[in-house]
Amino acid sequence: MHNYNIFLSFYNYISSGVLLFLKIIIVIISVMVSVAYLVYMERKVIAAIQLRQGPSVVGPFGLLQPFADAIKLIIKEPIIPFKANKLCFLIAPVITFTLALLGWAVIPFGSYIIVDNGQELIVPNVIANINIGVLYILAISSLGVYGIIIAGWSSNSNYAFLGAIRSASQMISYEVSIGLTIVTVLLATGSLKLGEIVIARHNMPYWIDLLLLPMAFMFFISALAETNRHPFDLPEAESELVSGYNVEYSSMPFALFFLGEYANMILMSAMAVIFFFGGWYPPLNVSFLYIIPGTIWFIFKIVILLFCFIWIRASIPRYRYDQLMRLGWKVFLPISLFWVILVSGILVYTDSLPKNTLNNTVYYKEN
C-alpha cells in the first residue's frame, strides 16, 4: 500500500508537469502565430484605409505572406557592427523577446467549471494562477526596457543610443499612469489575481463599470506609448533616427525585436480586456451569448483592440517628443491620481469596497 501511494504521488507529479509543459508550448505557439498574422492584419488594414490592396501574392489572399517574411529574415546574414559589444548586441533582442513571452504565464484565456461536493466552481484556464498576477505583469513590462537600452548602447551608434534613451524615458513615464489606472481596478475588485479580477468585474454593478471607463481610455493610450506604437513611436522615428534602437540589426536579431514588439501589443490588449472589458465573458449578460466559448470572446475582444492599434497608426500623425512627455507627466499622471482618489471615495461612500478576496484556487459561480 505504501509503494502504491508513492507511485500515485509520483504519477500525479509527472502528469501535472507534463500538463504544464503542454500549456506552455500551446501558449508560445499561439502567440507566435498570432504575431505573424497580426503583421498580416496590419498590412491589410492599412492598405484598405489607404485604398491599396496589401499582401496578395503569396498564397490565397496573401495568407502565406508571414511565412515568406519569416523565411526571408532567417536566410539573411546577421551583421554585427565592427565596434559593437558582440555579446550584449546579440543578447538584447533575446531579452526583449523572452520577456514578451513571459508575461503570458498569468493571462487567463478562459475558464472551466468543475463540480465539488455538488457545488459548481469556476477555475481560470491559465498557466500559472499566482496570487500576485498584476504585480508580475507590471514587473515583466518594466524589465522590457533593459533589452532596448542594451541594444542601443551595444550598437555603438548615436542613432541607436538616442532611440534607446527615448524608449526608456517613454516607457518609465507611462508605466506610472498604467499602474495608477490598474489601482482603480484593484480598488473595485480587491484582488491581484487576474482570474478573480475578471469574475469580480463580471458581477459588478454597471455604475462601477461607468466609473472605470475613463481609466480604460487612459490605459489604452498609455499602452500605445508603453509599446512604442504610433503616434508615440518616437524611439523608431524614421525621419530623425533612421530606425531607432534597432538600426544596426538585421536577420533574426531584428526579427526578435519585431516579434517582441507585436507580442507586447497583444499582451497589452489582453490586459485591457481583463481589467476593463470583461475578460472571457460576453459583452452582454444574455443567455444565448454564453453558447460561444469564453476563449472565443476573449480573442474577439483582443482583435478589436488590435484593430484600434492599427487604425490609429494609419490615421494620426506622430507626436513631438516634448508633447509626449507633457502628456504623460502633466495630463495623465494628475488625472489618474485624481481618479484613484475619486474611485476610493465613491466606493467607501457607497459601501462598495470588496469585503473579502475569493478562494486561492477556485471561484464560486454566482447564481
UniProtKB/Swiss-Prot annotation:
InterPro entries: NADH_UbQ_OxRdtase_su1/FPO, NADH_UbQ_OxRdtase_su1_CS. The gene is nuoH. GO terms for molecular function: NADH dehydrogenase activity; oxidoreductase activity, acting on NAD(P)H, quinone or similar compound as acceptor; quinone binding. It is an enzyme of class 7 (translocase). NDH-1 is composed of 14 different subunits. Subunits NuoA, H, J, K, L, M, N constitute the membrane sector of the complex. The keyword NADP does not apply. NCBIfam families: PRK06076.1-2 (NF004741), PRK06076.1-6 (NF004745). PROSITE patterns: COMPLEX1_ND1_1 (PS00667), COMPLEX1_ND1_2 (PS00668). It comes from Ehrlichia ruminantium (strain Gardel). The keyword Transferase does not apply. It catalyses: a quinone + NADH + 5 H(+)(in) = a quinol + NAD(+) + 4 H(+)(out). The chain crosses the membrane at residues 18-38, 87-107, 132-152, 180-200, 204-224, 257-277, 291-311, 328-348. It is found in: Cell inner membrane. GO terms for biological process: aerobic respiration. NDH-1 shuttles electrons from NADH, via FMN and iron-sulfur (Fe-S) centers, to quinones in the respiratory chain. The immediate electron acceptor for the enzyme in this species is believed to be ubiquinone. Couples the redox reaction to proton translocation (for every two electrons transferred, four hydrogen ions are translocated across the cytoplasmic membrane), and thus conserves the redox energy in a proton gradient. This subunit may bind ubiquinone. This is NADH-quinone oxidoreductase subunit H.
